[in-house]
Regions:
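Charged, low-complexity intrinsically disordered regulatory/assembly segments
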Residues: 229-232, 243-255
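Amphipathic alpha-helical blocks and their helix-capping loop/short-beta junctions
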Residues: 153, 158-238, 242
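Glycine-rich beta-to-alpha active-site loop
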Residues: 69-113, 135-141, 145, 156
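Glycine- (often His-adjacent) and acidic-residue-rich active-site loop
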Residues: 25-64, 114
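Conserved CoA-thioester-binding segment of acyl-CoA-metabolizing enzymes
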Residues: 1-24
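Contiguous mid-protein beta-loop-alpha structural module that forms a pocket-lining wall or clamp
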Residues: 120-177
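Hydrophobic/aromatic residues within transmembrane alpha-helices
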Residues: 23, 40, 91-92, 147-148, ...
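Short, flexible helix-coil linker/hinge segments at the edges of structured domains or between repeats
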Residues: 54, 99-128
């Protein structure tokens, strides 16, 4: 899939007849489906154990694709419906327009498997308000569409029942590309949902502003709040090395 996407996007980049790109997930059960759940973890594990060089090739090609998307010269619209995690974030966060729905489940869960937020996570997580990026990068918390909007990981949230109409607008053959794009954006604006900031605990910023993982863990351990206890319990099950790497990565991404 990575190679196919790269090849197609490069062809479209050079094609003057292609004015914009829109990307979505699909499923057998309907026109729209989960956007992208990321890489095949079983493949990663087996390849690492066996010393399969395809593992290095995969990551090299994936990161090339991410770079291509983040620097794409034409409008690139990502309809982030359903699951959008890991690699799915890598092919959506560089979009000109990021659209989520009430069905979206957005996350960078790499620390769950002893990895760090890759696919551009060191670039887009620092752009979250305050120190939410550090919190999301270390915990891998799954956000709804409207929560992702509050974290600056989406531009608009809409009801999923409006997706088919938006796609139909873009597929219209009776309007110019510019008119279709403007109509699509206008329709999204009219049906947009409000961001949900209710999940942003007041302790997030004062805790995750710290530079060292040990300081963050100590603050969480000493706090009496339910949020801190749950967060401490969660992080205690993760690799300290990879959490430290992730924290440093996101801090450096601010500069």
């Amino acid at each position: 899939m990575v190679l196919n996407l790269t090849t197609t996007l490069m062809e479209w980049r050079a094609d003057p007849d292609v004015k914009a790109v829109a990307i979505r997930g699909s499923s057998k059960e309907g026109e729209f489906g989960n956007f992208c759940a990321g890489g095949d973890i079983r493949f990663f594990y087996n390849a690492a154990i066996s010393g399969d060089r395809d593992l290095d090739t995969f990551f090299t090609e994936e990161y090339k694709l991410n770079h291509l998307i983040f620097n794409y010269p034409k409008p690139y619209i990502a309809f982030m419906d359903g699951i959008v995690m890991g690699g799915g974030m890598g092919i959506s966060q560089g979009a000109s327009l990021r659209v989520v729905t009430e069905r979206s489940k957005v996350a960078m869960p790499e620390t769950n498997i002893g990895l760090f937020p890759d696919v551009g996570g060191g670039y887009f997580l620092p752009k979250c308000p305050g120190f939410i990026g550090e919190y999301l990068g270390l915990t891998g918390k799954v956000l709804t569409g409207q929560q992702a909007l509050a974290a600056n990981l989406a531009d608009f949230a809409i009801n999923s029942d409006g997706l088919a109409n938006l796609w139909a607008i873009l597929e219209s053959k009776t309007e110019t590309a510019q008119d279709k794009l403007e109509k699509c954006v206008q329709t999204i604006r009219l049906g947009s949902l409000k961001k949900d900031e209710g999940w942003i605990d007041t302790e997030i910023h004062s805790t995750f502003e710290n530079e060292e993982l040990s300081t963050i863990m100590r603050i969480l351990e000493n706090s009496e709040s339910d949020w801190a206890k749950k967060t401490h319990s969660m992080l205690s099950k993760r690799s300290p090395l990879m959490m430290s790497v992730s924290l440093k990565q996101i801090k450096l991404g601010r500069h």
